[in-house]
Amino acid sequence: MRTLKKRMAILLALTLMLFALGAAAGEDLPLIGIVQLVEHAALDAARDGFLDELKDQGYIDGQTIRVDYRNAQASPDILSSIADHFIGEEVDLVLAIATNSAQTMAGKTETIPILGTAITDYVVAKLAKSNEEPGYNVSGTTDMNPIEQQIALIRQMAPDTRSVGLLYTSSEDNSVTQARMARGFIEAAGMQYVEVTVNNANDVQQAAQSLVEQVDALYIPTDNIVASSMPIVHEAAVAKKIPIFCGEAGQILGGGTATLGISYYNLGRQTGQMAIDVLGGADISTMPIQSQTQFEYTINKTMCDLIGLEIPAELLPFAIEVP
């Protein structure tokens, strides 16, 4: 009996030792914190692309790296708490998805490397001194879209459009930048614009309903708050039978009409490769901001049918049914 108890004690000690060694090994793995402003198709795709690129290169959560993903639900207070959490955990790298995420994180640490994605203009957002050499602990990928071509798409699909409604969030630097550019391209195309901004998701319904009464088409940049509320905008536009032209494909899947934009999944993969470089010792302050150079049409045939908009023959190959 004593022999059995002794063997059991030895077995228990060995088990605890192996568990402790495993835990210690896990703690030695590089820790990547991911902070995402809000859930919507574009930001989710960027995150998926980032993680897939890491996985394909052998950086697997729980095996060769650790990943701590947090979503701020569009709340500045939650963003701040997430940043504090990552600093307390002494993460090795942060992926900040969307401008506000990167700004909050960068405002709290000058030492932890921060890679951004789904950010339009790092310099305007005061995240970098220049795109060529950021100069701070922040680099990443930009989601700047071909805005001039997107405005041209309005003319191509709805040639009788005389006025365009701009709907975006006033506190999102990325949206402000794109709206400023869009205003110039709209006027250059011989159209007028009407602008309504929102502060949060609660404002979207009233803003959308106001705009559709005044314009022939809507244009929405890659705006996170509005993107997360696309079904509301869709409902308002369908009621007045006007098209919604958007900054990215995720907004089309949410109820928009058409876009020519980047792939956020590919943007995330591009950011993942940058993360591998940073984990390998690259100096993030000298890593140029990267961008996508290929753009894709996405046309919502379901929406076009609802509002009676004919899709030009040359764009039919890009038309999809959206449930």
Model-derived segments and their meaning:
Residues 2-7, 11, 26-323:
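Short hydrophobic alpha-helices and adjacent helix-cap/hinge residues
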Residues 11-19:
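Bacterial N-terminal signal peptides
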